[in-house]
From Swiss-Prot:
Residues that hold NAD(+) according to the record: S162, V163, G164, P165, G166, T167, R168, K169, N170, N273
InterPro entries for this protein: Acetaldehyde_dehydrogenase (IPR003361), Acetylaldehyde_DH_C (IPR015426), NAD(P)-bd_dom_sf (IPR036291), Semialdehyde_DH_NAD-bd (IPR000534)
Organism annotation: Ralstonia pickettii (strain 12J)
One BP term from GO: catabolic process
Residues at the catalytic site: C131 (acyl-thioester intermediate)
Catalytic activity: acetaldehyde + NAD(+) + CoA = acetyl-CoA + NADH + H(+)
Enzyme class, broadest EC rank: oxidoreductase
SS bond list: none
GO molecular function: acetaldehyde dehydrogenase (acetylating) activity; NAD binding
Keywords: Aromatic hydrocarbons catabolism, NAD, Oxidoreductase
Protein name: Acetaldehyde dehydrogenase
NCBIfam families recorded: ac_ald_DH_ac (TIGR03215), PRK08300.1 (NF006157)
Length: 311
């Protein structure tokens, strides 16, 4: 039987519940704990029904069980406001933290762009940016690897029903963290991010718009080829990631229009924002788990998360 790395999920909301479904299909990850604060939450109930251990006492309810149950990776899908403390407590026990909040106290990870850069660094906290960042930063990077990008702007439009209370509390952090990652991972000299929460019924699929201003006249053929190649990379783990229109060239502006359909693991397929975030987090954790299984990554208890500014 293939060895699996045991995981805990913190936050049984939309993102945590969708992620749980993906982890149960993973060849190298085994979810064993779901952590919440409301014993009546739908996410904790679903986890219990799946045979996952649960606690409604927050991370403090998990800590006594971490070593006994062999938890080595934790996913935090709570809020930017509590993530730093959650990470500190679990890092102290040698648990690697995958951060799905916009806290961004660890380095950014957007798998098709910079996943392999995290190999061998013994990082104890990795930040998955935001759903909007995961959907759009690959496109900014696809342009910036061809030629310098002076400015990158992304607009993520998501259905209101797919946006839980944690994300709503973190709108400012969402925009700051995404804009910072457009620069640091996407390669734009200046980045801007906008999120639109659409209340339409029936709910609309996630749509994303990316605008890049190149410093010199765009090499249309090279940029188009780069974008098409990057789309294929994202589709390896998010099959519903589609280029709807573009790249459209207007002077030095390059525009790309995307939509992201989910797998429907928890919320229906319109919630592609959940899928692109949870699939990216699972892919990242799988890389670290493969390192652990090979003996190439030994987690060190007490290692503090590395600090990254969220400009």
């Amino acid at each position: 039987m293939t060895q699996k790395i045991k995981c805990a999920l913190i936050g049984p909301g939309n993102i945590g519940t969708d992620l749980l479904a993906k982890l149960q299909r993973s060849p190298v990850l085994e979810p064993v704990w779901m952590v919440g604060i409301d014993p009546e939450s739908d996410g904790l109930r679903r986890a219990r029904e799946m045979g996952i251990k649960t606690t409604a006492e927050g991370v403090d309810g998990l800590l006594p069980h971490v070593l006994a149950d062999g938890v080595q990776i934790a996913f935090d899908a709570t809020s930017a406001y509590v993530h730093a403390e959650n990470s500190r407590k679990l890092n102290a026990l040698g648990v690697l933290m995958i951060d799905l909040t916009p806290a961004a106290i660890g380095p950014y990870c957007v798998p098709p762009v910079n996943l392999k850069e995290h190999l061998g660094r013994a990082e104890m906290n990795v930040n998955m940016v935001t759903c909007g960042g995961q959907a759009t930063i690959p496109m900014v990077a696809a342009v910036s690897r061809v030629q310098p990008v002076a400015y990158g702007e992304i607009v993520a439009t998501v259905s209101s029903r797919s946006v839980g209370p944690g994300t709503r509390k973190n709108i400012d952090e969402f925009t700051r963290t995404t804009a910072g990652a457009v620069e640091r991972v996407g390669g734009a000299k200046k980045g801007k991010a906008i999120i639109v929460i659409n209340p339409a019924e029936p709910p609309l699929i996630m749509r994303d718009t990316v605008h890049c201003l190149t410093e010199t006249e765009p090499d249309q053929a090279a940029i188009t080829a780069s974008i098409q190649a990057m789309i294929k990379e994202v589709q390896k783990y998010v099959p519903g990631y589609k280029l709807v229109n573009g790249p459209v060239f207007d002077g030095n502006r390059v525009s790309v229009f995307l939509e992201v359909e989910g797998l429907g693991d928890y919320l229906p397929k319109y919630a592609g924002n959940l899928d692109i975030m949870t699939a990216a987090a699972a892919r990242t954790a799988e890389m670290f788990a493969e390192e652990m299984i090979k003996g190439e990554l030994n987690l060190r208890a007490g290692t503090a998360a590395s600090a990254t500014e969220t400009a």
